Amino acid sequence: ATGVLGKGGRGTPDHFGVAGRIDLVTSTLGKALGGAAGGFTTGRKELIELLRQRSRPYLFSNSLPPVIAAAALKAIALVEHGDHLRVNLMEQAGWLRGQLAALGFTLVPGHHPIIPVMLGDASIATHMADRLLQEGIYVVGFSYPVVPKGQARIRLQLSAAHTRAQLERAVAAFATVGRELHVIK
């Protein structure tokens, strides 16, 4: 949620008004903050120093490449003043959720730009992701052991850069492939 939720993109703690009561915040750099790799943990100096000394994942991990760190810093600067982008992103996500639900897809409820489309069967999720790619729509299928058995899904991940025309094209592809695979009527 860092970069998307909360004032200035400050994430879930800010969104729910509990930022002052959270000891540690961890987040990814793989979504709003540059779309690359890696992540971060932030908190009081004493806690971070303890983690630096005692956390095996930290001790045995390589540092982020400087270019990734620079991209994340630039992304943070952009999202701090990007409330208009977040508003547009949430509007686009709401519109897309509405369109997919109207087609008959089962969605995990929420008000965020990551939209899980529940399919249940792992082979259907894989096949649908492959077919959507053939239609020019890149999505990721998830199945066991990433999610519980019987809860396979496709995950859509929106960006503030997606246009309405692109989303309309995605909806059309979902309709075509969903009907072809008998996921929707």
Regions inferred by a protein language model and the residue ranges of each:
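Active-site pre-lysine segment of PLP-dependent enzymes
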Residues: 1-24
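Active-site PLP attachment segment
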Residues: 17-50
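Short hydrophobic/aromatic beta-strand micro-patches
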Residues: 42, 116-120, 157-159
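A short glycine-threonine-serine/GTX helix/turn-capping micro-motif
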Residues: 55-64
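Conserved PLP-dependent catalytic core of the aminotransferase class-I/II
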Residues: 66, 70-138
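PLP-dependent enzyme catalytic core of the Aspartate aminotransferase-like
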Residues: 134-138, 146-185
